[in-house]
Amino acid sequence: MITTLYKEPASFAHEFSNINLLWASLFIEELVRNGISDFCIAPGSRSTPLTLAADQHTEAHTHVHFDERGLGFLALGLSLFSHKPVVIITTSGTAVANLYPAVIEAKLSAIPLIILSADRPVELIDCGANQAIDQYRIFSHYPVFFAQIPSATTHIKPNYLLTTINQGLQQQRQTPAAIHFNIAFSEPLYPQTATLNYQGYLQSLKQWLIDKQPFSQYFQNKDSFQAASNTQLRDKKVLVIAGRVTGINQAQAIAEFAALNNYPLLADLQSALTGNANNLHYYDLLLVNKQFTENLQQADIIVQFGGKLISKRLSQFIEGFAGEYLLVDPGNTRIDPAHSLRKRFVCSATQWIKSLQNKIPDIDKHWSQVLQQQNNYITKQIISPFLDNNLISEISVISALDKLLPADNPVFIGNSMPVRLSDMFFRQNAALPFSNRGASGIDGLLATASGIAKSCASITTLLIGDTSFLHDLNSLALLKQLQGPFVIIVFNNDGGAIFNLLPVPTQQKQDYYQLPHGLTFADSCRQFSIDYYQPESLDQFVGDYQKSLQNRLSLIEICVKNDQTYNHLEYIKEQIKYATF
């Protein structure tokens, strides 16, 4: 027997018997906000929070059937006729497996189904617990999106659920088929008499609770770009962030957009815009200063182009930002580690900027000017005086390279300390920056830089840490294939100096994190016929680098104490933190 139930509309509550019921209600609410109205439900205990949430939602039409296999095909029929996604809710165990035939048909017929399968919590899997099977990706490649949702907890922001739902729906819009959310529910599953007030927990959804729109909205065509963009940006203080951007024309479009509208720009190293006049070059360091941060928080909206930001402080700023936050990026992957993104434009920077058509009216140039003045102040009063000596250090070498790197030639910057310092201290760099910031690993960096050098046949510079270099030492064999010049700059701080910046236990720091090796790389260079330099002053480094630009293969080893960079950064941050502008 199949039963269909209809109800009348109400607003989202703050009080629930337990967090399972809250999370389930968030799930159903966000699906309804995305225009989904049909919910097919099979009976089961573990799926109780989802069943009750669907039943209690006034805009959810529920269809009930005792057999999951038939329920799956019922959902297919509903979707076939309505041309809308249909939700299927099941309990755990073989109940989920019975949906497999419908999931296959959905894939082959391009029919959008949304599976919400309840699961046992992780501690009850593979231990003999009742009705507990491995449901992780149970439908193999047939769904176009899968998410394993952990057991509900107040330690995970509710935003995570909403952004995950919307990412799945976005994938489904592009490739209609099933999407699968496997949701672990710990007990209690049922309502109790007493309720808890979750208003504080839901604070990060304040605007979502008011506006009745999906938390994350995706825009993909020109009309929607123009309507959304012009409405949002008009008469607003806009902060532009440039993340990883592909192509010089994209970077130039972002720079012109910021300059034309007097918007402050925070340019990540990967954007190739660090030398732009509008860029607040030292924003990462300035974010330790309360006055600067408060000024930056006056922004009404953040427009971010590209993702994978290097600066942790900037990512934290975005996470705590109270205004509107939108992202422009042509890729399909989610770029939202803070789970705070409300609007995502799936297009290139040039497409999005062109869709604005006209110059947005100027507003409050003073705000942008104050931010630039604060950036200029620390440049003149703190950074420049600190660098005004001949001391060789990781920071001084990067600051020197900022002026020395050949324009329009590639520089590959290794992960860990080199990329962070480069992001902090490059100011006018006109080289083409590259890095492996997808997974941010420290392996294969020399080999990647070699590939770039083979492709471009121009001067290539590699900036790499000693531990990363040790990881990829055998890739020196690749260099014999290069025409050159190829310049390797190794920061040798005798192990993982990056861990000085992290709160690792002091007692175990050397033996389990930094692993000092006591090695230098002169002999490695002899073995592979590479010119070797080890400068002892900044002036020597400048001379050695300029000579290396005339050689085929060169390695410049910068040997510094393990704690030098940590001490220098702490000094600089302390000066900036207490600066008054």
Swiss-Prot record:
The keyword Protein biosynthesis does not apply. Gene3D superfamilies: 3.40.50.970, TPP-binding domain. It comes from the Bacteria. CDD domains: TPP_PYR_MenD (cd07037), TPP_SHCHC_synthase (cd02009). Pathway: Quinol/quinone metabolism; 1,4-dihydroxy-2-naphthoate biosynthesis; 1,4-dihydroxy-2-naphthoate from chorismate: step 2/7; Quinol/quinone metabolism; menaquinone biosynthesis. Keywords: Magnesium, Manganese, Menaquinone biosynthesis, Metal-binding, Thiamine pyrophosphate, Transferase. This is 2-succinyl-5-enolpyruvyl-6-hydroxy-3-cyclohexene-1-carboxylate synthase. It comes from Psychromonas ingrahamii (strain DSM 17664 / CCUG 51855 / 37).
